[in-house]
Regions:
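Positively charged n-region of N-terminal signal peptides that target proteins for export
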Residues: 1-5
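Long, charged/polar, soluble alpha-helical segments
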Residues: 22-187
Length: 187
């Protein structure tokens, strides 16, 4: 690199200092939709239906913060905090947006496994698990639709609804679950 090029770059940075800061501001404003311990749980959980279970747990934690409702005992809350970290924080729009992103990531996980092995027996199980949670999410977020106070909230609710609808549509295409016989019928 020549001195002339360096001089030109420095001059541009002095003239447009906001351009240099733009990258750091965007990174600082980026919000991760999982806590650090949730990410660790996801990385450790390689079996599809169990991994989707971690996504479902992450969604349930955000719904608990949004609604303020909990049915967990103090012992269960302590165990969850050890496994998944502190409950997530943020505005209502942030938490609803997190749920939309988590649903999207769960869809991607199922799609990835399906692309590699269409006949994987865990796909229907994982999809049904996710569909049950998607249905619950839509039901619990309905009151928030009328209370939405910002465009970000409205957009987040729309994203969640769209993801939930695609999950439910895919689950409706599944054949009925096969009942597992724990014991063979005796003749």
């Amino acid at each position: 690199m020549t001195i002339r090029n360096l001089t030109l770059i420095l001059a541009l940075l002095l003239i447009f200092p906001s351009a240099a800061k733009a990258g750091t501001i965007n990174r600082a404003q980026h919000r991760d939709h999982f806590t650090e311990l949730e990410v660790e749980q996801i990385k450790e959980t390689q079996i599809l239906d169990k991994r989707i279970g971690v996504f479902v747990k992450a969604i349930a934690r955000r719904l608990r913060v949004l609604t303020g409702a909990t049915t967990d005992t103090a012992k269960q809350q302590k165990k969850d905090a050890e496994l998944y970290g502190a409950l997530p924080t943020g505005s209502r729009a942030d938490l609803i947006g997190d749920i939309g992103k988590i649903l999207d990531e769960a869809i991607t996980n199922i799609d990835d496994v399906s692309a590699r092995d269409e006949k994987n027996p865990l796909i229907p199980t994982a999809l049904r698990l996710l569909a049950n949670e998607a249905k619950r999410v839509v039901e619990q977020l309905q009151p928030f639709q009328s209370q939405a106070s910002s465009d970000a909230e409205v957009a987040s609710i729309e994203q969640v609804t769209e993801n939930a609808e695609s999950i439910l549509a895919a689950a409706n295409k599944l054949p009925p679950p096969v009942a597992k016989d724990k014991k063979k019928k005796q003749e």
